[in-house]
Amino acid sequence: MSASSTRPSYAAVLRTPHATRTFTAALVGRLSYGMVSLAVLLAVSRATGSYAVAGIIMALFGAASVFLSPLRAALVDRHGPRRALLPMAALYAGLLGTLAAATWRPGAPAAVLGTVAVAAGACTPPLGPTMRAVWGELVTDRRLLQRAYSLDGVAEELLFVSGPLLVGVLVGFAPPAAGVAVSALLVGIGTLAFVTSPAVKGVAVRASRVRARRRIGRGIVQPVVVAAGVGLSLGAVDLLVLAFAEQRGHGDDTVAWIFAALSAGSAVGGLLYGAVEWRAGTRVRLPALAAGLGLSLAVAGLAPGLATLTGAVVCAGFFVAPALTTAYLVADESAAPGARVQAGAWVNTAVNAGISTGAAAAGLLVGRLPGEAGFALAGGAALLAAAAVAVTVAVETRYPRARPEKQEQQQEQEQGHAQEAGTA
């Protein structure tokens, strides 16, 4: 179920047995997540006639999805992707379908819509963390795994760019609720195709056999801290860019191009990062990449005009996907074999929680502080996270010691292999 290559490349990743089918299925399901936020927001606002109600319901949906993610991931680790993801996807798709039906015409009670949205968010299948755990099973070469994670991260970035565009196309000839319905359909089809892949079936068997007293080691703290710092920075950037453009008389269409430039920079940075043979370890690279993002954003606040700001934002984007890719790699290294989905979910939760918090903080500070100070604070969040992790890495390097979690993971691996040999 694993593959290695003498010349690690993105093509080698996709040539790994079952990789293309599994990855494609996961992307189909994850496209739903790129669509659902805008689709629900538009559908609820149309049904209730209130942007305030739509915003509250969307926030509740997002909170249920984000903060319960580690719990859902733990269920996947415990029961395997097939037994855990299918019920989650069925509930999630069914609830989104209910929400689509309720918002198809105006007049739906806000309380009913909020209840359905929260329930749907609570059932969101952790397809991203599960796919990254599957990459760890498909690819044993760490160099190839870096490319797999980079490819996964860039693809996810593109999904969250193309998802809103797809919603925009749909609302051109159908009610906004159609976007919610399509989102439900995508997650159902994608999850079913994903869990029936031979690669995922193998993960399910192995995950159910591994037992651990301590499933996630202390090493998970470092990637979670960096992910939270990156999320805080990214969450603040959107409002800061919007305020920067408005102060100089530019419209929303111009802002959209700057956001696209950030995503493009992240995609290019992720692909280049994954293609490099790095000598430094992942824990050394992790704070360095977060620091690069923080410095780029701090400098962006000094931009005299929109063109310069766009260039600075592109430079910041170069560090986004690499930083998150490395965070997921470190989380994977820190987790026991049967806890990889949960480890990835903690990083994912940290990013999303950071984005929400950063956006809220920026909303309070924009207009009260100069733009330069706002960008400095946004960059400072990533820099602070980088500094905290760099200190812990330096201490671990200077005072090396055996890590208990590593010993436990080795014992788990030995127990898992012994059980597999006994049942073969």
Predicted regions and their residues:
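Helix-to-loop junctions at the C-terminal end of transmembrane segments
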Residues: 67-81, 171, 268-282, 366
